[in-house]
Every structure is written in structure tokens, then in C-alpha cells.
Amino acid sequence: MKLICKLLSVLLCGFLLAGCAPKSESRTFFAMDTVMNLTVCGEEGLLDDLQARVQTLEKHLSVTDPQSEIYALNQNGSTRLSDDTRELLELALGFCRATDGALDITIYPALCAWGFTTDSYQVPDDDTLAALRETIDYTAVTLDGETASIPEGVMVDLGAVAKGYTALVLTRMLADAGVESALLDLGGNIQAIGENPEGRPWGVAVQDPFGEGYLGVLSVTDRAVVTSGGYERNFEQNGVIYHHILDPDTAAPADSGLCAVTVVGENGLTCDALSTALYVMGKDAALDFWRSREDFECILVESNGAVTVTEGLQDCFRAHVDAVTVAERG
């Protein structure tokens, strides 16, 4: 078995095309199983508070920390939740419903069976996959006030939305502090706040899933940019590559014809949740879903190399590839 694992600390390579002014402060640290970098312009002393908030959220939301609320829920079948965890769980279930289960926060047993939680990779047999499919059901999660409950065999994992929610929380903190310019890189989940100090949009490069270069550069202001791609974590067995984005309907890696999805919008949680869901849906269903909503734009990269950009990104995406199709709402 050959392991292929492209774990980029900055998934989108969210570099600054125009840097912060001299008063900027930056902090790099490890949390939520990734490297994070926070850059805040024009305001001193906030980085300690921001990092502490991230670490608190991690303690609540971790699926592996025996002290976390999610761990307690999975072990005991029921637990009381903090305000943060309750809010995120409620919002995550909303995205599960909105995407008709393309995002499912109960996928964790399948991730474990494939070895993506431990890096001990294996391909489950058909009987195992059939049994796993019976455990994937977000509708089995109940939330009654501060208490969450799940039946035996079901397990919750908020990993597909945790960094997006963290971006949302940090954005609120910065707004309360009056910060007008910042760039938050939460392991590739990028949140651009305001313009850069030179009065121009932040530049965020989108990774080319087929190589070391970039598909292009997004110029964004007050936007989140989140990518999900099968190239991020995968393994090869008997000549077949298996990636970590699982289809809840099959409990196996999604075979949707897509290899990367980038979602751009105001809300980091929305972008995080939908980057996974759209990948599972595939191009046609993803574009139909986009046409039904007004809160995001996206870039879809197919396994054959074709790139589709939704029309709302035409003016802010500078492509580095030749053939790009623009999807229209009409």
C-alpha cells in the first residue's frame, strides 16, 4: 500500500499580495490538527485572545479529546453542550438538511473504518460498508435545549464545519474590537476581513489540485474562501487512489467527477460546510444548488481538468489556466 498524502498547511495558499502595514501582528500556531496563521492590522494585543478562543473551541469540538463535549456525546449517547457547541451543532444539522445529506455529521464511523482518523489506511469490504451505511444518519441526532443525544452506533464529528465556525467566531471578536483589516488562515480556511492596509482586496491563491501551482487568484474583501479536495489526504491500494471525502450514501470516497471545490462567501461556516457537500454532489447538482441560493459562489474542478467558475466570481478571479467555463444563474 502506497500512501499519497498532500497535507498543505495552507490549503488555498492564502498569501498576501499586498502586505499589512508595519503595525500588523501575526501569530502562527497549531490547533484543530492544522497550522493556523492570524494576521491582524492596526490593533495590538488581540492575538492572545484569538488563539485562546481557538483552543477553547478545539477543546469543546474535538472528536478524539476525552475531555471534549463531542467525545462525551459519542461515548455516552447524550451530553449537555456549551453555547458554542450547541450553536454549531444546530447550524451543522441545518446544512445537513439543506444539502439533503450530502453533508452528514455522522460520517465518523466510516472515516474510522477507512483509516483516515489514524492514518492506518485500509479498504473496508462490502459487508463492512453496508453496516457503516446504517450508522450514517444525521436525522438520528436530537438537540433538546442544551442536551444532544444520539442512538447507539451513531457518532458525531463536526470536523467538516469546525474551522468554518471558528472563523465566524473570530470574525465576531474582531468586529467587536473594531478591527477593519485582518487575514485569518485557519489551515486553509481563509477569512479576509476588510481590505488590506493599502485599500485593496486581499489576494488568495487557489491551489491547483493537479500540481504545485495555482488555478488562479481571488481578490476578496470581507469574504471567506474554503476549498475541499480529494488531493488533500488520500492513499493508494492496488493501483486505486482513495480520498478522505466520503459520500454518506455509500460510506466510500465520493465518486462525483470532481477533484476540488472552492466556495466563496461572507460566512466562513457556510463556505466550510458547502465545500464538502458540493464535492459530494458533483458538478451538475452543485450548480443547481448554487442557483437555488444567494449566499455563495464557487469554483468546481473536475477530474478531467475542466474548471467551472460561477458568474459572481468573474470580476474577482484571475485564472492561471487556459480553459475556464463560467456558470450563469439564468
Predicted feature descriptions by range:
Residues 2-9, 14-330:
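Mature catalytic core of soluble alpha/beta enzymes
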